[in-house]
A protein has these predicted regions:
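Post-kinase regulatory C-tail/linker adjacent to protein kinase catalytic domains
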Residues: 264-270
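Core catalytic lobe of class I
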Residues: 2-246
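Short, conserved SAM-binding/catalytic segment
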Residues: 2-8, 249-263
Length: 270
């Protein structure tokens, strides 16, 4: 498959297979990677089924994770998602290459499938890792959240002189309670596994700075790219589906030969 490129001075989209697209990215040129690959659980993406033999899927993961290692800077960070079924395989692959900093639980409001003979799943794992043990970007002051003390009264720290109220903000724990994207939300795009803007915003604010380059090798709805646009980062995105690339071109205002009516936002339940 021939790779197609759509770009301006800040954003670049490559339409093609992920491993082919990696050849377009220079070694140690990326500050942050967010990757949300197909989970190998049988979902359909633009007419293609996401289902491979387990061994084949693991070998494929090893290939693109190796490419992430090649392109990310020594000070860079990587966030990888996967299903609860395949996360252990991915975790072991990454431990041989990166320094794992956190294993994050993204907890959302409800399971998409109402299970009858097991407990329904309402979370997805995120692996946060870095190429170096120290010296990586982590802007804790940019992602503070309200500390939930359970108290109705203002808590005072009497160890301080003079005594003062406890700081009401803290760095988030590794359990992120962020709602999933729903059909009626303004941010909804026609993609079956779209990730919330709030989740991507937290990742980008924590592990990159303005002007840094962020890579998403499985761009899908291009929500990572859109968050980079809002937060003044550069963005590189790969996507195999032309249907989803059109979403990216629209969301990032990139020049293309597609007519305006082809790029118009459509809302269809997936």
């Amino acid at each position: 498959m021939k790779i197609k490129k759509f770009s301006n001075e800040r954003f670049t989209i490559y339409l093609g297979d992920v491993l082919d697209c990696f050849s377009k990215v220079h070694e140690e040129s990326v500050d942050l990677v967010f990757a949300d690959p197909p989970y190998n659980i049988g979902k359909e993406f633009a007419g293609a089924k996401d289902k491979f033999e387990t061994k084949e899927y693991i070998n494929w993961m090893e290939c693109w994770i190796g490419e992430i290692w090649r392109v990310v800077k020594s000070t860079g960070s990587v966030y990888l998602m996967n299903s609860t079924q395949n996360f252990a395989h991915m975790d072991l692959i990454c431990q041989s290459k990166f320094f794992v900093q956190s294993r994050i639980v993204w907890a959302y409001d409800s399971s998409s499938v109402q299970a009858k003979r097991r407990f329904g799943s309402s979370w997805e794992p995120i692996l946060h890792m870095t190429k170096s043990k120290t010296g990586y970007t982590f802007n804790s002051e940019n992602i503070l959240v309200e500390a939930k003390t359970g108290s109705q009264r203002k808590l005072i720290d009497y160890r301080k002189i003079p005594p003062r109220p406890y700081n009401k903000e803290k760095v988030p724990s590794n359990v992120w309670e962020i709602p999933r994207v729903r059909f009626k939300m303004d941010e909804y795009e026609n993609h079956p596994t779209q990730k919330p803007h709030a989740l991507l915003e937290r990742v980008i604010l924590a592990s990159s700075n303005q002007g840094d380059t962020v890579l998403d090798p499985f761009s899908g709805s291009f929500s990572t790219g859109y968050a980079c646009k809002e937060l003044e980062r550069k963005f590189i995105g790969f996507e195999l589906s032309e249907e989803y690339v059109k979403i990216g071109i629209r969301r990032l205002d990139l020049p293309s030969s597609y007519t305006r009516n082809v790029l118009v936002k459509k809302k269809e339940k997936k």
